[in-house]
From Swiss-Prot:
The keyword Metal-binding does not apply. The keyword NAD applies. NAD(+) binds at G12, A13, A14, G15, Q16, I17, G18, N106, Q113, V130, G131, N132. It comes from Legionella pneumophila (strain Lens). It holds the Pfam family Ldh_1_C. PANTHER family: MALATE DEHYDROGENASE. It comes from the Bacteria. This is Malate dehydrogenase. Substrate binds at R93, R99, N132, R163. Belongs to the LDH/MDH superfamily. MDH type 2 family. Catalyzes the reversible oxidation of malate to oxaloacetate. One of its GO terms (molecular function) is L-malate dehydrogenase (NAD+) activity. Keywords: NAD, Oxidoreductase, Tricarboxylic acid cycle.
Amino acid sequence: MTNNRVRVAVTGAAGQIGYALVFRIASGQMFGPNTEVELNLLELEPALPSLEGVAMELDDCAFPLLKRIVCTADLNKAMDGVNWALLVGSVPRKQGMERSDLLQINGGIFTKQGQAINDYASDDVRVFVVGNPCNTNCLIAMNHAKDVPSDRFYAMTTLDELRARTQLAKKAGVDITAVTQMTIWGNHSATQYPDFYNAKINGTSAARVINDQTWLKETFVSTVQQRGAAVIKARGSSSAASAANAIITGVNHLVTDTPAGESFSMCRRSKGEYGVDEGLIFSFPCRREHGELKVVENMEFNDFGRERFNITLNELRSERDTVKSLGLLD
């Protein structure tokens, strides 16, 4: 018995992440077994034949919850009436490309997407940005969707959090479910700070349970920060199935109240929490309570944690200043 319907836009839908994602949305894994799904799938014009193949496969799965598929290269059509916009597609950094080049190219893309969301999406739209650099892409899209409340924009550090939980569980020799309150602070980049001091293993600080400061500060932190690059080196292309899984998990966190004693990492617009500049898209520890998303307060930092926190904060400030200088922000 279904009692709900959600229309979801997925950009870059024929790409590797999109291909790993859309079947799981259609099966009910993102919004649950009582929510019907309509998919608006966006691709570049040359990729439309491939996208039609994805739509054929979706049809061939005969998902009971999937009620409609739209395949298009028209951004406005893709965003028409959507309740969720999953912005997966972006231009990857290529050899010889400066970070400012990457920000400028993607800035143009996310400017247009923000405008289309503003003009065509449902009044209750929520926006989940995956395409990198996702924090600043989210900031740009948010800036160009003036009619959409800024607290409905998110960027993903869910994959980083899941990577960190796994590394701690393996090192401690415990089940993955024993690891809770694992926070990724800051930017979804190699400066992110996976906070092992405030993470818990069976309710005790992970730093006390593992009790190997060298491993935690050096191996653990760098493994989480560099995991994406390690996957590329190992398989020849970037994380796709794990990224899609993280999108499912991340959106599920945003639509389901958080269990007691748990939190999750999510990039959202700062209101000044923990001294972060208001307006930056920054990854915080979050909880959803009675349908409202809140930043977990009163987490403490030692000198190591504060140093790492400031490094990632400064990188996000730099990205913001760069895109502002490029005319991508008001």
